[in-house]
Amino acid sequence: MSREVLPNNVTPLHYDITLEPNFRAFTFEGSLKIDLQINDHSINSVQINYLEIDFHSARIEGVNAIEVNKNENQQKATLVFPNGTFENLGPSAKLEIIFSGILNDQMAGFYRAKYTDKVTGETKYMATTQMEATDARRAFPCFDEPNLKATFAVTLVSESFLTHLSNMDVRNETIKEGKKYTTFNTTPKMSTYLVAFIVADLRYVESNNFRIPVRVYSTPGDEKFGQFAANLAARTLRFFEDTFNIEYPLPKMDMVAVHEFSAGAMENWGLVTYRVIDLLLDIENSSLDRIQRVAEVIQHELAHQWFGNLVTMDWWEGLWLNEGFATWMSWYSCNKFQPEWKVWEQYVTDNLQRALNLDSLRSSHPIEVPVNNADEINQIFDAISYSKGSSLLRMISKWLGEETFIKGVSQYLNKFKYGNAKTGDLWDALADASGKDVCSVMNIWTKRVGFPVLSVKEHKNKITLTQHRYLSTGDVKEEEDTTIYPILLALKDSTGIDNTLVLNEKSATFELKNEEFFKINGDQSGIFITSYSDERWAKLSKQANLLSVEDRVGLVADAKALSASGYTSTTNFLNLISNWKNEDSFVVWEQIINSLSALKSTWVFEPEDILNALDKFTLDLVLNKLSELGWNIGEDDSFAIQRLKVTLFSAACTSGNEKMQSIAVEMFEEYANGNKQAIPALFKAVVFNTVARLGGENNYEKIFNIYQNPVSSEEKIIALRALGRFEDKELLERTLSYLLDGTVLNQDFYIPMQGIRVHKKGIERLWAWMQEHWDEIAKRLQPGSPVLGGVLTLGLTNFTSFEALEKISAFYSRKVTKGFDQTLAQALDTIRSKAQWVSRDREIVATYLREHEYDQ
């Protein structure tokens, strides 16, 4: 199958777009003038992208189209003109189109977002946009491909009291007969997916700490929560200018909180849009986690102003050049601004593990994956493009050195600014900066699916390393195991890390300086898993003092992954973490708890005595450290100590420790009775979840009331998620009903499922409910949207049996899965992996728990 692209007989140079939304009919009227370069004068038609657009007229240099042939499936319209029309044209011509469209509620194209006015209590709407990947064609007919860059001049028309925003600053604004007409200055050359415009009742705050205006817009009543974002954005823009040695080229930066938004944010050039929760911060009521999340999202989107906007991938298979870079740069800048957050340590337990988890599935895809149409393109906005892409950049930056890496990146941006680039162009720039053959080492990592597991065999003063493709199911076939990954070994011993060693073949032997202590993948910078002998695992578990935080996180994650896939026994993982009860790093503890939670969720349908024993194991692990630290947040507690306390407290509550649960209930009762200082912001999620887990209709009503009247957008989401934790049948049905009756916004459709998925009753009822309402769910949510992807993942991947796998497969075999077939395949692979793990190690885990007396 080949790319579904437009013919190259014309090339767009400039768009003049005028749009007027109608908030009563939920439609919009538009007119369009496109300056075209004529590449072939023998044609008599122009093909253009569109979706859900009505064409009222089309003409080129005064000659009317004689017909408009629309192909909704291909999302293309052919404008047919009289024979000879183009023969009489010069090298360029102006195409004019009058059209109208739907101001939809699908969070795509030019759409409406519903909200409640905080001042008046009225239900209102804002008209906003989400063009990436292929929805600019929903807003106006266009040549909707990333390498067909052009300039854009936008005019918006509406009632006079509404605010108009677009990528550029205002050129002129007039009021005629009660309507406002705003024309914006012409953009630089850019891709259609970055065009943005908003018509809404908005207020703003700004920062003057950058050479251009930096503003944060929100609906009335929320504007005061935008100052953190405005200040951070100004600082970040200045930092990126200095880092890349390239000025931000637009005359302003607007960031807007949008009430219904399918992703987290969108990097539209000069007009970045966000979910409310990912932009606005009530500092007094926000957790440290939320503050860090907002900072990362803002810095990710602002990095895109260079990576993606200034230099754009040539086609969507190069999406990682946008998303991988923006992800890496957000962590890089966060680390520069807030070193106490220890973000590069967190990276290993966050982004790297997210990448490995998805890439361990047979249904994963390469970083550079061939995509041909809109349905395929929308499905690659996943952990491969974002997390594996950024993990690859982290690996390269460690190999080349950060300073050299940034130098090469700056060269890449300068060479291709206002244009398009391919992955090879990046390798060339990094090679020029470093003098190393970057392409030969890195090319395979982007072109091939998966990653290796490295098996270590020890000899006298030597190790033999052998690589195979890693699959979480542990059943890699010979034909799937042909890739030889160039592995940067980063061999660590007591003298440091040797970054010169590379495994370029299936198997090779290396000298050891120190047999007593060594670790492959020092500081966990590589994208692979390491499998040691049981004896080496036992040694490493007692050598924590010789290992960095990243090393310890990596060992925990690797041990769990090797257990899940059958490379080692699950007891190996349990023994490792049992030796680390005195661990001081919150990052390592978070990985321990995450990995243990993965084990528990795989065992969720096992007998109660086994689940209780796993809870006792968890409590044995965490209670001593929790007792040593205490759970109260002190005024002098660092970011790291606060995170550690809440991680341990949460594990204790989740595993049934009655003392910690009673503390959580006390805090909640005080909070619900009006003492808003009763729960530290960082503890709010665990407190709400604990109360919900303990159940009761009275508590349900209290949490539901908090959901309807939250003190912050973060609290609203915490409450909504907690509603899913109630196991009572009637309360569970009530929560599910909110997803379809308008109580829960479509953007938050999956949030209650995050709570429902953690208990057996919820898992089974959620799947039954999804089957009952699938047609409505599929109609309500866009096929390729992150929201539907979340629903599938949360609704399906908690099953752990081959029987469930067969039933789910059979159900979807009768459904149209276009637009989410890849997500579905990944969900089924996840179930298969869990089923194999639990069937293989069921008795081994039971024996371990019995022998260590956790079954008492």
UniProtKB/Swiss-Prot annotation:
Active-site feature positions: 301 (proton acceptor)
Residues under site feature: Transition state stabilizer: 386
Residues that bind substrate: 132, 264-268
Binding site for Zn(2+): 300, 304, 323
BP GO annotations: glycogen metabolic process; peptide catabolic process; proteolysis
E.C. designation(s): 3.4.11.-
Top-rank taxon: Eukaryota
Biological role stated in the UniProt entry: Positive effector of glycogen accumulation. May be involved in nutrient-sensing.
Further comment found in the protein's record: Present with 77000 molecules/cell in log phase SD medium.
Protein name per Swiss-Prot or TrEMBL: Alanine/arginine aminopeptidase
Organism name: Saccharomyces cerevisiae (strain ATCC 204508 / S288c) (Baker's yeast)
Lineage: Eukaryota, Fungi, Dikarya, Ascomycota, Saccharomycotina
Encoding gene, per UniProt annotation: AAP1
